[in-house]
A protein has these predicted regions:
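Short helix-initiation/N-cap motifs at beta->coil->alpha
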Residues: 27-37, 152-166
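Proline-aspartate-enriched helix->loop->beta-strand connector
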Residues: 35-49, 66, 162-181
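Flexible loop/hinge segments that line or gate small-molecule binding clefts
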Residues: 18, 58-85
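Basic- and aromatic-lined ligand-binding clefts that recognize polyanionic substrates
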Residues: 1, 92-145
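A short, structured surface patch at a secondary-structure boundary
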Residues: 1-42, 46-51, 144-147
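Solvent-exposed loop/turn segments at secondary-structure junctions
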Residues: 12-15, 32, 46-47, 52-56, ...
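Structured C-terminal subdomain patch of bacterial secreted/periplasmic proteins
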Residues: 77-98, 105-107, 171, 175-231
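His/Asp/Glu-enriched short active-site or ligand-binding loop at hydrolase and phosphoryl-transfer sites
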Residues: 10, 135-159, 204-208
């Protein structure tokens, strides 16, 4: 969006490491909720937040007469929808749509050569994103098969299913992606190897949380798509 229109951002690992946001006011720290007082002090014309996580703060601001916009980006289509909304809401913004279309070009393959991929977003407990998740939509877009597609079940996180040891043994992925394992990545992969005796070490890959599980930023999305395209 138009950088001159941006006056404040959350203080996250993404924004704190990006020089483009170095001079902007932080309205939150880490995973904490944004401060209504700090936001009001900036006198914004529009406050954009994540549907669900920021709902309470957005509701409070709306009651105080501040214009708000809640977005939910849990599928690729939702990202495209959000980009169209932002272009209409914020004047002098570059074409977000054109940038997004170049991040992760859609790829189509014949069913016979599509690679089956298991994504483990958590190791304890073991959780895997289903089709109705950001990760699932990326796999679809890149012509990859989600190894948990069609599996029933759920977890405490919407769009994810808990993977028991029995389920891990039953599915036959060709690639296993482990997201930001705590501790030693090598040990984590070694602990998973017995569940997939037909796979080699090179069939396991460590991926970042941002881009694959949480969209994060356009840069993190591009990196995740590039890594997935190499599978």
């Amino acid at each position: 969006i138009n950088p001159d229109a941006l006056i404040g951002v959350p203080g996250t690992s993404l924004t704190n490491k990006d020089s483009r946001y170095s001079g902007l006011k932080r309205v939150s720290n880490g995973r904490s909720q944004p401060s209504v007082e700090l936001i009001l002090a900036l006198k914004p014309d529009l406050v954009i937040g994540a549907e669900g996580f920021h709902s309470r703060v957005l509701t409070s601001l709306k009651k105080l007469g501040v214009s708000t916009l809640a977005v939910k980006v849990n599928r690729w289509e939702k990202l495209e929808q959000a980009s169209r909304t932002l272009e209409n809401k914020i004047v002098d913004s570059d074409s977000i749509q054109s940038k997004i279309s170049k991040l992760c070009p859609s790829q189509k393959f014949s069913k016979s050569i599509r690679t089956s991929v298991l994504i483990l977003a958590g190791v304890s407990p073991k959780m895997s994103p289903g089709q109705q998740s950001w990760s699932g939509s990326l796999l679809d877009r890149l012509g990859l098969v989600n190894a948990t597609k069609g599996l029933p079940g759920s977890s405490e996180f919407s769009g994810y299913i808990t993977m028991s040891n029995e389920r891990l043994l039953a599915i036959k992925p060709e690639k296993v992606l482990v997201v930001n394992p705590s501790g030693d990545a090598t040990k984590t992969i070694e602990s998973l190897s017995p569940f997939f005796p037909g796979l080699k070490k090179t069939d396991f890959k460590v991926m970042d949380y941002y881009g694959l599980i949480n969209p994060g930023s356009l840069s993190s999305i591009k990196k995740a798509c590039s890594n997935l395209s190499d599978l």
